[in-house]
């Protein structure tokens, strides 16, 4: 059973009302292009939503992914915005991995997207700007563009990555993350993408970078 199959099974148990008989057009495209990752029949059981990445925001999905973290290493989020997701992730981490001494690191320019993005909603350069850097316990925020902050970060933090949440939407930003962490993403690293598939331009952004 693939990881996606397991997620789908948990979704079914978590909320039966999501089950319907039709497939959204964007999800048909996913089935056609990456059959090795997704079983076509699975999409008959999913309720149409604006985009798949909304499902990943459900608490149950965060919990499922963190349950599968086995490495002792860095916990990272790329694309913090107002801090809602990293707050949830950190609370689950503390519950499921109480012995972990690692803090969460959040990366964001806090100046909005560096370029236009056509995702679940069309956003322009500068959109998704946060008024201020969030403040929360056991979390360190790194303000700036990924191409500047990640190289400096990896000079100081050389541990392998245990968990990486990529919520930066754009191909260019995702490439910055994956290239700079290439030596620290190892077998066993859990990577959660927020916008991997499920919207019209999915195959030219996070998916393409991965």
Regions found by a protein language model. Name each.
Residues 1-71:
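Rossmann-like AdoMet
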Residues 11, 31-49, 68-210:
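S-adenosylmethionine/decaboxylated-SAM
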């Amino acid at each position: 059973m693939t990881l996606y199959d397991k997620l789908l099974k948990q979704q079914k148990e978590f909320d039966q009302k999501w089950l319907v008989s039709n497939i959204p057009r964007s999800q048909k495209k996913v089935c056609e292009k990456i059959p090795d990752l997704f079983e076509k029949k699975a999409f008959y059981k999913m309720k149409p939503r604006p985009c798949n990445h909304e499902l990943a925001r459900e608490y149950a999905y965060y919990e499922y992914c963190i349950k599968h973290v086995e490495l002792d290493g860095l916990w990272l989020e790329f694309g913090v915005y107002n801090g809602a997701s990293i707050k949830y992730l950190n609370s689950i981490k503390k519950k499921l991995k109480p012995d972990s001494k690692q803090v969460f690191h959040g990366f964001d320019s806090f100046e909005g997207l560096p370029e236009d993005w056509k995702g679940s909603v069309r956003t322009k350069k500068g959109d998704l700007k946060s008024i201020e850097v969030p403040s929360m316990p056991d979390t360190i925020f790194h303000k700036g563009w990924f191409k500047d902050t990640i190289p400096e970060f990896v000079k100081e933090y050389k541990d392998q990555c245990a968990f990486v949440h990529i919520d930066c939407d754009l191909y260019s930003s995702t490439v910055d993350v994956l290239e700079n962490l290439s030596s620290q993403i190892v077998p066993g690293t859990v990577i959660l993408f927020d916008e991997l598939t499920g919207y019209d331009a999915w195959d030219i952004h996070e998916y393409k970078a991965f």
